[in-house]
């Protein structure tokens, strides 16, 4: 296998990163993808940075053993806790992380009020505070931690009345304060777009960073002459939880796949 045809590793604390995986496949259809769902340790948002760093070192080492030419941290919480650590550990390995879309949201808002839905870990991080200082000094940013949403999505619940009530409890206070731009600061949350679209006025912009991450990955691979010229092989999945659970939820969030294996804990 030459370097161009080597796979790209993508990880998340669970299934949320599938929203990013879809954007990567859309932009880079010739690339072979590997996906690790660390669902046995979800949610990351309530875990300590040291715990998350330990998990990410393990996952990164595994993906390198699989021959991954690059790694995407398709998880905001993992990015803020570990991306600097991983870049120091693997300085020549292309690494792409996630961050809430503060810059485009601050540019898009008309009311001057931006809402952020994210995990506690992301919202309390120094990296997020730096994003606000850099790009959002002229707008009001209202942050909303969203406990419970990740767990619902991990269980395959995208439509229940209980989920709708939970989500409305997070979104309605932001709208009441004049928010006209909503940042989805967790890769699980794009799967709630249909429900959100029913819940917010049509002129409220909903922004996530999946497509931007795919473009950044394309740029990094292009700079290193690592873009594949195809054809892609079938995506392989690993999970630190029950593989049958991931097999059941994949058709809802991605597509049917039997290539689901247990991730070595």
Swiss-Prot record:
Gene Ontology biological process terms from the UniProt entry? cell wall organization; peptidoglycan biosynthetic process; regulation of cell shape
Q: Which GO terms describe its molecular function?
A: glutamate racemase activity
Q: Does Chaperone count among this protein's keywords?
A: no
Positions of the catalytic residues: 75 (proton donor/acceptor), 186 (proton donor/acceptor)
The pathway is:
Cell wall biogenesis; peptidoglycan biosynthesis
Task: Give the first-level EC class, as a single word.
Answer: isomerase
Under the heading InterPro entries, the entry gives: Asp/Glu/hydantoin_racemase, Asp/Glu_race, Asp/Glu_racemase_AS_1, Asp/Glu_racemase_AS_2, Glu_race
Q: Where does substrate bind?
A: 12-13, 44-45, 76-77, 187-188
- Look up the domain of life of the source: Bacteria
Q: Which PROSITE patterns does this entry report, sorted A to Z?
A: ASP_GLU_RACEMASE_1, ASP_GLU_RACEMASE_2
> Which Enzyme Commission numbers does its entry carry?
5.1.1.3
The catalysed reaction is: L-glutamate = D-glutamate
Give the matching Pfam families.
Asp_Glu_race
Q: Keywords assigned by UniProt? A: Cell shape, Cell wall biogenesis/degradation, Isomerase, Peptidoglycan synthesis
Q: Which NCBIfam families match?
A: glut_race
Q: Which PANTHER family match?
A: GLUTAMATE RACEMASE (PTHR21198:SF2)
> Could you tell me what this protein does?
Provides the (R)-glutamate required for cell wall biosynthesis.
Family, as annotated:
Belongs to the aspartate/glutamate racemases family.
UniProt xrefs under HAMAP family:
Glu_racemase
Q: What is this protein called?
A: Glutamate racemase
The organism's taxonomic lineage, starting at the top: Bacteria, Pseudomonadati, Pseudomonadota, Gammaproteobacteria, Pseudomonadales
Name of the gene this protein is made from: murI
């Amino acid at each position: 296998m030459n370097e161009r045809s080597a796979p790209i590793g993508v990880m998340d604390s669970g299934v949320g990163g599938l929203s990013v995986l879809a954007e990567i496949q859309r932009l880079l259809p010739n690339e072979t993808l590997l996906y690790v769902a660390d669902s046995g340790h979800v949610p990351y948002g309530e875990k300590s940075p040291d715990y998350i760093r330990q998990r990410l070192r393990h996952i990164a080492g595994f993906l390198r053993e699989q021959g991954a030419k690059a790694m995407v941290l398709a998880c905001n919480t993992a990015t803020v806790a570990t991306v600097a650590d991983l870049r120091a550990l693997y300085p020549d390995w292309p690494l792409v992380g996630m961050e809430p879309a503060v810059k485009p949201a601050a540019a898009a808002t008309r009311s001057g009020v931006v809402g952020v839905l994210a995990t506690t870990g992301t919202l309390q991080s120094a990296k997020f505070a730096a994003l606000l200082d850099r790009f959002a000094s002229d707008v009001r940013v209202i942050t909303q931690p969203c406990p419970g949403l990740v767990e619902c999505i991990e269980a395959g619940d995208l439509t229940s009345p209980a989920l709708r009530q939970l989500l409305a409890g997070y979104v309605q206070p932001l709208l009441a304060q004049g928010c006209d731009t909503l940042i989805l600061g967790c890769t699980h949350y794009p799967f709630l777009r249909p429900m959100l679209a029913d819940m917010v006025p049509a002129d409220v912009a909903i922004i996530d960073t999946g497509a931007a991450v795919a473009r950044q990955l394309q740029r990094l691979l292009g700079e290193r002459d690592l873009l594949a010229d195809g054809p892609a092989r079938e995506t392989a999945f690993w999970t630190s939880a029950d593989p049958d659970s991931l097999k059941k939820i994949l058709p809802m969030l991605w597509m049917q796949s039997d290539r689901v294996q247990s991730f070595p804990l």
